[in-house]
Amino acid sequence: MKLSETLKIDYFRVQLNAWRICGALDLSEGRYWSWSMLLCILVYLPTPMLLRGVYSFEDPVENNFSLSLTVTSLSNLMKFCMYVAQLTKMVEVQSLIGQLDARVSGESQSERHRNMTEHLLRMSKLFQITYAVVFIIAAVPFVFETELSLPMPMWFPFDWKNSMVAYIGALVFQEIGYVFQIMQCFAADSFPPLVLYLISEQCQLLILRISEIGYGYKTLEENEQDLVNCIRDQNALYRLLDVTKSLVSYPMMVQFMVIGINIAITLFVLIFYVETLYDRIYYLCFLLGITVQTYPLCYYGTMVQESFAELHYAVFCSNWVDQSASYRGHMLILAERTKRMQLLLAGNLVPIHLSTYVACWKGAYSFFTLMADRDGLGS
């Protein structure tokens, strides 16, 4: 099955549509000689031009803004390439989620599943609103400037200030890059926390199924079959977690490496250089976007770890005492397997955990003081 045919995954429909528009789905299926490749070249062509213009401006605000945009654009390019290489695994993600959803039964499980779906929709809308606000504040207000200006401080091989045709060409070039990079950034940054929250809730649903075994009017054989089905659900849940790790691990490593630098640059400019109200609003919104990039990811990564830890105790919440010897044998196997700690690592190195989020802010403070000392603003 082609990835472009799997958009019926309701939980990630918006993210997959964003990847489809940006050409990621075509590239992941091997269609390199297509419009998608040309679009990606056009979208990321500003990256070396931004790199060429770093610290080439007289205004320190533009210099630091250019540095932040360059770091962000480079990280977006790296994350985009990593996702393209792994996006075909979304087909298996769809299958595993469908398998687990089909096991939802009973009023308590149905209510929890319904709440999970509603929360996923709210999270997705929050990301959409955040990135839409960042785009509007970043890409639109240049029209209110008294002089000709561009949304991004960037090096161009031609003089766009003295030619209206060159200016319009540079403006369209930058706006296209802004639109598609923010769209790619939205998909890449919103998918990991959404899927981690979904895994955490699927684990909680499995806990409910296991803990309810033996308290109804079913026979011993039926209770044993329910436990065997829960073991199959456990296998599917572990597989879903493994596939998710392979999808988000390295892109999140890039994000953790970049987040501290961007926070430091944003706060540095906001505290020492920004004077106008608009600039303050822009950098505050940019800081909000950076926070939304990472905090939900670390929070739901912590939730996943805690949910899998609770799975071990759910085994003994069932009415196992009155069950058959065969049931208790299966129960012991299930209990032993749940002892394995499920640790999410970005790049197989950094935990996707709230402690890492705190460490990112500590790293941002260190980089902030380094920048302040460099410019003689630390005292």
UniProtKB/Swiss-Prot annotation:
Keywords: Cell membrane, Glycoprotein, Membrane, Olfaction, Receptor, Sensory transduction, Transducer, Transmembrane, Transmembrane helix. InterPro entries: 7tm6_olfct_rcpt (IPR004117). GO terms for cellular component: dendrite; dendrite membrane; membrane; neuronal cell body; plasma membrane. One of its GO terms (molecular function) is odorant binding. The chain crosses the membrane at residues 37-57, 65-85, 126-146, 163-183, 254-274, 281-301, 341-361. The gene is Or23a. Interacts with Orco. Complexes exist early in the endomembrane system in olfactory sensory neurons (OSNs), coupling these complexes to the conserved ciliary trafficking pathway. It is a multi-pass membrane protein. It is found in: Cell membrane. Glycans are attached at N64. Its main location: membrane. Odorant receptor which mediates acceptance or avoidance behavior, depending on its substrates. The odorant receptor repertoire encodes a large collection of odor stimuli that vary widely in identity, intensity, and duration. May form a complex with Orco to form odorant-sensing units, providing sensitive and prolonged odorant signaling and calcium permeability. Expressed in 10-40 sensory cells in the third antenna segment and in the maxillary palp. This is Odorant receptor 23a. Residues 58-64, 147-162, 275-280, 362-379 are extracellular. Residues 1-36, 86-125, 184-253, 302-340 are cytoplasmic. The keyword Secreted does not apply. One of its GO terms (biological process) is signal transduction.
